[in-house]
From Swiss-Prot:
CDD domains, alphabetized: ADK (cd01428)
One Gene Ontology term of the molecular function aspect: ATP binding
Organism in which the protein naturally occurs: Wigglesworthia glossinidia brevipalpis
InterPro entries named in the record: Adenyl_kin_sub, Adenylat/UMP-CMP_kin, Adenylat_kinase_CS, P-loop_NTPase
Annotated metabolic or biological route of this protein: Purine metabolism; AMP biosynthesis via salvage pathway; AMP from ADP: step 1/1
UniProt-annotated binding residues for AMP: R36, E52, L53, I54, G80, F81, P82, R83, Q87, R151, R162
Protein role: Catalyzes the reversible transfer of the terminal phosphate group between ATP and AMP. Plays an important role in cellular energy homeostasis and in adenine nucleotide metabolism.
Subcellular location: Cytoplasm
EC number(s) reported in the record: 2.7.4.3
Protein name as annotated: Adenylate kinase
Gene Ontology CC annotation, any one: cytoplasm
Catalysed reactions, semicolon-separated: AMP + ATP = 2 ADP
Gene it is expressed from: adk
Location of region: LID: 117-154
NCBIfam families membership: adk
Length: 210
């Protein structure tokens, strides 16, 4: 089972991808995590801080290289890729079969609240939200050691740029996968992400388990 999760910043892609990864025993490939790990090797860090999209060809090559190192027949969950039409076409041109494309749709007015309240455990990679999904405990020690941190691109100054880029590209990607779905090449579904984590998970499971 090969699944793509796309959606705006704060729509819950990473959270849902991790839940699905555990449930279906599939590797979770996060485009964002891959790029953040690359920033020591190249100049990606500066672009991430500004909320700017990385060069299409560079991102595509990095993600495709990652996909080469896993069992494509067993499947995977690809989170946050493709973000542009070029990237979507690259998956198709490289003959990587996709079974499901799930788009988590979140209205722009909710994106700010979701993203600006997001914190991440630097050690485990677990994603929390100060309002909607707070960690069970936050000690002075954990704050001092900066175990709970904000992502570089979650700063308000970078967020608007990310939102603009997303909506500029999302229509093209949606149309691309609608066409693929009509041609029975995959299943493309839009899921309202303005719900709690468990409700969204159940919506996803209902689609996949049909």
């Amino acid at each position: 089972m090969r699944i793509i999760l796309i959606g705006s910043p704060g729509s819950g892609k990473g959270t849902q991808a991790k839940i699905m990864s555990k449930k279906y025993n599939l590797p979770h490939i996060s485009c964002g995590d891959i790029l953040r790990k690359q920033n020591k090797c190249c100049d990606i860090n500066k672009l991430i801080k500004k909320g700017e999209l990385i060069n299409d060809k560079l991102v595509t090559n990095i993600v495709l290289e990652k996909l080469k190192n896993i069992n494509l027949f067993k499947g995977f969950i690809l989170d946050g890729f493709p973000r542009t039409l070029y990237q979507a076409n690259s998956i198709k041109e490289n003959k990587i079969k996709i079974d499901y494309v799930l788009e988590l749709f979140l209205q722009e007015k909710y994106i700010y609240e979701r993203v600006l309240g997001r914190i991440i455990d630097k050690v485990s990679g677990e994603i929390y939200h100060l309002k909607f999904n707070p960690p069970k405990f936050i000690t002075e020690k954990s704050n001092k050691n900066k175990i709970l941190v904000r992502r570089l691109d979650d700063k308000k100054s970078a967020l608007q740029k990310r939102i603009n880029d997303f909506f500029k590209n999302s229509c093209l990607i949606s149309e691309f996968y609608k066409k693929e779905s009509l041609e029975k090449k995959l299943k493309y579904k839009i899921i309202n992400a303005d719900f709690d984590i468990n409700t969204i998970s159940n919506k996803i499971f209902n689609i996949i388990n049909v």
